[in-house]
Every structure is written in C-alpha cells, then in structure tokens.
C-alpha cells in the first residue's frame, strides 16, 4: 500500500512542491483545508522528499538541501581540498570557500547556511503540519486500512522532521558536550503554529529529534522497504548516531547516552523481517549504486525517484559530466587531500580500490567515486549522474557502536566492531589496544569509512578534537594561514554557522551566534 501511495505522490511531485512552498510562515491559510483528506496527506508527505531536491523559497540551485548538507559536512573537514578556484560565475564561487575556510558569512548569497536554515524550516513546518493533520484524520476515520496507512505516514513525517532538526542543530548549534541547556539550536515549530519563535536549546532540539525518531521507529513497519523513503531501520540507525553525539568527548564520556547508542545500533540489526547487512567482498563496490535495494544503506536521497532523473549536483564537485571527450577539462575542482591519502593503505584497502580514481583533470591527484552512480545519457553523447546522497548506512552504525563501547570502557567489544569494518575493507585486524589508542583507531576508521559522506567534520566537533589540514587549498592563496585551515571546537565557536541576517530581520526573536 505504501509503495502505491508514494508512487502517486511522486507523479504529482511538482504540484506537491508548489503546495509546500506555500506552506511557509507567511502563507498558511490553505494548509488545514488542503490536508483534510487522506490523498492530500499522501501527496504532501511525498512532496517532502522532493524538497531535498527543490530550491528553498524559489531561490537558485545552490539552495538544494542535499548539496548544502554535503558542503557543510564535508568541505569543512580535511578529506577534500580545492585544486582550482571556483569560477566567478559559479554558484559556489563564494559559498564553497565560505565553508572550507570557516569564513561563515551571514549573507545568503555567500553561504550555504541560508540554504540549510530556510529549507530545514520549510520541511520541519511541512512535516509538522502533516503530523497534526494525520492525528486529526486518524481520530475521525473508521477505515482500518486507512488508519494503518496514516500510522505509516506519521512515521515517515516524524523521521524526516527528526532528521532535519538534528542536522540543522549541528550546523547552527554547539556540540552537545558544551552547555546544551544554554547554547541555542533552532526554533522548533512542532505544533505547526507558523509563528516566529525563539531558538530552542541544543538539548531541546536533540530531545525533539530523539522523540521523532522513536515515533518513526514505532510507526514504521518491520519489513524490507525502499531505502529512499523513511523506514524503521533508518530510524534505529539515526538514534544510534544522535545518542553517540550526546555521548561526550572520549576524556569525559556520558555513560547513559553511550549505552543508548549501543542499544539502538543493536536494534538496527535485530529486526525480524528486514535484513540490514554490511556488504562484503565484491558487493562492496556497488555500495552507492542502488539505494533502493541495497542492504547496507538505511536512508538515502536519490534524484532517480524523479521522473526527469535530475542530475545530482554533488557529483559535480568530484568528477566530470557532459560529453566524455571533455572529461579532462570539465570544471570540477575538488580532489582528495594528501591528508586523507596518508591514512589509507592504497595497496590493501578495498575502499581505496573501489571508491577512488585518478583525477582526469589534475595529474597525480585522486577523486572519490562515491557520486559516480546513476549515470545516464541525457541526450546524444551527453551524460549526467542521478547518484544518491547517503544519509546513514549500516557501516556507520557498526562504528557508532564501536565508539560507544570504547567510551563505556568495553574495549573488547569495541575492537570487535572496529575489526569487522577493517576486515571487510581488506585490512588486518588490530589487537591489544584500549583507551585513547583504541579511540584514535576508531576515529581514523570512521574517517576512512565515511569520507565524502558529510560526517568527518562533525566527528571532530562532537569529540572536541582539533581539525587540522596538513595541505592547504593553494588555489586560494589568501587562505593558507592556520586560522583558515584548522579549528579547535574547545576554543573556537566558529564551529557554528551564523544565522542568515535576512532571517533575523524577519524574526526579531532570533539571537545570532557569536564568536
């Protein structure tokens, strides 16, 4: 039943996106009326997925959520450098360097922060409106099949809302170990009031995201599902991640939260009717090709769900598109950093073999292949890539559990999980390590495993570790000083993006981040 309704929703995706564009604080007059029918709730829920691809507030392509999510999670770390400057006409001309060098502009034309802020609030409000409408309709319907599907729809909306709240809090808030009751996250309009609200605390934001993921896990069925839609396994996986983010620095771990990270990691792999696996051997090389049926991916956004198979702009940072004859001159300018090359065993590590390739543009450099999936011929001889953006997968959940076990002092269990990921990558198991030595190995393994998936930067921040680049992006000669290429979360508040000034002018209750 779910597949049927979501396919209907996707067919009407453009109309849904337009409806969601109207469902913003300045115009909510028709929302209640529109969401009074079951079919419209189905369409509105499907439209939320479409909003990952559509521009926020009718702005340009740079405001696509999945692009901004990637840039702010990946470019601010040390796996990628710019081997060439973005062209002056490029939408990344200012936004790419703004993230990479921690310039953190509050202008929407210069930073991806506005994209995350605007799109997050649009989707959070849309999901909240849907949940309110679902609860009303559930109370008034007597059709058992419709009730069952309303429960499922509530789970999907709760998952998406939790995901957006959690991600935005990491962008605009301080890490959880730093006064979470005092430091601010984002406004939480979970009642769908569409009113200007104050920012909630980081703790309140995390607790709301947890509540949403728990609702999703309770409402979504234990069955194999299309991983490009919200599902129970992804809900458990996100709970393992968020509790890990709350689990403190390795020097001062919080036992209760780390135990919850272990609990929900276990839940991810303990469902009766859904199979979640970490891909092994030859299967590993296909990890990023088909998220719909992949047993390791828990949740991913894919442009392939759209009738037009829209090109994924994240691909453009790392590889060519267009005519194959122009592959060596195509405009992509990101390459794998020497920092990352140094931590990889390029002879033995299957992740290097399967997921990197020599750059076609820059001799002696490498690019990631994680966004080379979904290749299709848009027209004669011209190729585009409708590759997925993975938000969470089973390989991460194993490493979540390994880190949580380490912080609980259960070194044997932590080492077992760490070695599970190492051995599937073709590396030898480790033994006889514990404490900070074990933590360092887990941290580096997360970097090897999750590079180019918008995770590494937040691993540095949530663990209070200084992020340092050994190699500068020399294409930007003005930004080779250390203040542009390292950040210490324990001494610098520039880990947070600024709230866009335009949003503060619209909502006088907002308090700007201070450095």
Q: What positions do the PLM features span?
A:
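Sec-dependent bacterial lipoprotein signal peptides
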Residues: 1-14
């Amino acid at each position: 039943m779910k597949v049927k309704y979501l396919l209907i929703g996707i067919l009407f995706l453009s109309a849904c996106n337009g409806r969601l564009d109207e469902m913003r604080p300045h115009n909510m007059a028709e929302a209640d009326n529109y969401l009074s029918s079951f079919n419209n709730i189905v369409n509105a829920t499907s439209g939320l997925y479409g909003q990952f691809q559509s521009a926020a507030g009718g702005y340009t392509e740079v405001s696509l959520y999945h692009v901004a999510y990637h840039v702010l999670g990946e470019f601010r770390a040390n796996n990628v450098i710019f081997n060439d400057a973005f062209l002056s006409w490029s939408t990344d001309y200012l936004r790419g360097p703004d993230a990479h060098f921690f310039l953190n502009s509050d202008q929407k034309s210069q930073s991806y922060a506005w994209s995350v802020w605007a799109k997050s609030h649009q989707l959070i409000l849309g999901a909240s409106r849907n949940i309110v409408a679902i609860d009303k309709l559930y109370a008034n319907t007597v059709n058992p099949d419709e009730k069952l599907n309303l429960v499922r729809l509530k789970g999907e909306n709760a998952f998406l809302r939790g995901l957006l709240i959690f991600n935005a809090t990491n962008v605009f808030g301080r890490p959880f170990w730093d006064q979470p009751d005092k430091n601010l996250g984002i406004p939480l309009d979970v009642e769908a009031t569409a009113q200007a609200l104050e920012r909630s605390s980081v703790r309140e934001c995390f607790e709301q995201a947890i509540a949403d993921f728990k609702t999703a896990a309770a409402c979504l069925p234990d069955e194999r599902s299309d991983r490009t839609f919200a599902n129970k396994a992804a809900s458990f996986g996100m709970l393992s991640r968020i509790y890990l983010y709350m689990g403190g620095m390795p020097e001062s771990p919080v036992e209760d939260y780390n135990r919850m990270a272990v609990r929900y990691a276990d839940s991810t792999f303990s469902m009766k009717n859904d199979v979640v696996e970490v891909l092994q051997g030859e299967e590993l090389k296909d990890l990023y090709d088909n998220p719909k049926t992949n047993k390791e991916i828990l949740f991913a956004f894919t442009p392939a769900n759209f009738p037009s198979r829209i090109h994924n702009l994240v691909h453009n940072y790392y590889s060519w598109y267009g005519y194959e004859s122009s592959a060596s001159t195509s405009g992509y300018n990101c390459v794998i950093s020497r920092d990352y090359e140094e931590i990889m065993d390029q002879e033995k590590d299957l992740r290097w073999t399967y997921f990197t390739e020599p750059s076609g543009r820059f001799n002696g450099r490498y690019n990631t292949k994680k966004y080379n999936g979904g290749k299709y011929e848009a027209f004669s001889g011209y190729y585009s890539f409708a590759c997925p953006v993975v938000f969470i997968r089973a390989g991460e959940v194993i490493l979540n559990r390994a880190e949580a076990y380490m912080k609980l002092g259960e070194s044997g269990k932590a080492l077992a999980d760490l070695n599970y990921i190492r051995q599937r990558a073709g590396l030898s198991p480790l033994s006889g390590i514990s404490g900070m030595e074990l933590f360092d190995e887990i941290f580096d393994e997360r970097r090897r495993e999750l590079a180019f998936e918008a995770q590494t930067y937040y691993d540095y921040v949530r663990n209070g570790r200084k992020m340092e680049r050994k190699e500068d992006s020399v294409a930007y000669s003005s930004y080779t000083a250390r203040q542009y290429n390292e950040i210490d979360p324990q001494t610098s508040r520039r880990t947070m993006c600024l709230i866009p000034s335009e949003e503060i002018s619209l909502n006088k209750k907002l308090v700007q981040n201070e450095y």
